[in-house]
Amino acid sequence: MKKLGTDLLKRGFAKMVKHGVVMDVTNVEQAKIAEEAGAAAVMALERVPADIRVQGGVARMSDPDMILEIKDAVSIPVMAKARIGHFVEAQVLESIGVDMIDESEVLTPADEINHINKKAFTAPFVCGARNLGEALRRIDEGAAMIRTKGEAGTGNVVEAVKHMRAVNEGIARVVGYHEMGLEAELVQMARNELKVPMEIILEVAKLKRLPVVNFAAGGIATPADAALMMQMGCDGVFVGSGIFKSGNPEIRAKAIVEATYNFDKPELIGEVSKNLGEAMVGINIDQIPEEMLLAKRGI
């Protein structure tokens, strides 16, 4: 019963930022801009994904002092990233009071096989996923929120779209098998393809969606990008490099928040998309060497 209560508490926090925008920030000034723009939360990190991609090297957890400065400066929730499998980085982030931990493929993985046992923590976790199997495995480990991996730092939404479609298609298969009474197929799918307990599969079949909130992330750079992902069924969006690598961060941040809340109103999205200044320079995915693709980290 204690485990259930803890899971409900973690998932409850994740639902608090539903329909909102989480913005990457690297300093107090950016965090205040994000808060004033209406961000539901900020992700505190020393380098946005675009800079990590360009500068290379080993990307690690941010300096706790920088994260605490941002926590002191804003009233909205503050998230921070830990490396995949690096449970000590997660312990540190929990100890300084971050509101949610992102076990992130944007940072250099500490463990290429094992993810963090998120059930051992009080703080809720968000994790990336490219398909239903990855999403459910992270939920089985204790994740309270899922996000598409996309391809961070590119300003190109194509991978986020691909990952969201893959999750939706997987859910449709589960629901279809369940409604047709094909329990043997569901058991086989759980065991051989998704590699998760049947209990989670049945929860998906009943809810007809993931049992936790599912945000879009990776390559979102414009209000239309945010609305696109929301119309595909996302519960909110993460925006990394797309705001503070653009020509007018303050206006673009507000526009993306407006588009996320009003994702089904094209006239309003068109209005807030006017005169935003230059968007961040995007990268075509096929121009990225295979070994530099971040979304492949952590399956």
From Swiss-Prot:
Recorded GO MF terms: pyridoxal 5'-phosphate synthase (glutamine hydrolysing) activity
Family matches, as Pfam families: SOR_SNZ
Catalytic activity: aldehydo-D-ribose 5-phosphate + D-glyceraldehyde 3-phosphate + L-glutamine = pyridoxal 5'-phosphate + L-glutamate + phosphate + 3 H2O + H(+)
Annotated binding of D-glyceraldehyde 3-phosphate, by residue: 165
CDD domains: pdxS
GO biological process, alphabetically ordered: amino acid metabolic process; pyridoxal phosphate biosynthetic process; pyridoxine biosynthetic process
Binding site for D-ribose 5-phosphate: 24, 153, 219, 240-241
UniProt-annotated catalytic positions: 81
Keywords, alphabetical: Lyase, Pyridoxal phosphate, Schiff base
Keyword hit for RNA-binding: no
Alphabetized InterPro entries for the sequence: Aldolase_TIM, PdxS/SNZ, PdxS/SNZ_N, RibuloseP-bd_barrel
Pathway: Cofactor biosynthesis; pyridoxal 5'-phosphate biosynthesis
Source taxon at top rank: Archaea
EC identifiers of the protein: 4.3.3.6
Similarity comment text for this entry: Belongs to the PdxS/SNZ family.
Subunit details: In the presence of PdxT, forms a dodecamer of heterodimers.
Function as written in the Swiss-Prot or TrEMBL entry: Catalyzes the formation of pyridoxal 5'-phosphate from ribose 5-phosphate (RBP), glyceraldehyde 3-phosphate (G3P) and ammonia. The ammonia is provided by the PdxT subunit. Can also use ribulose 5-phosphate and dihydroxyacetone phosphate as substrates, resulting from enzyme-catalyzed isomerization of RBP and G3P, respectively.
NCBIfam families linked: PRK04180.1, pyridoxal 5'-phosphate synthase lyase subunit PdxS
Protein known as: Pyridoxal 5'-phosphate synthase subunit PdxS
Organism: Methanococcus vannielii (strain ATCC 35089 / DSM 1224 / JCM 13029 / OCM 148 / SB)
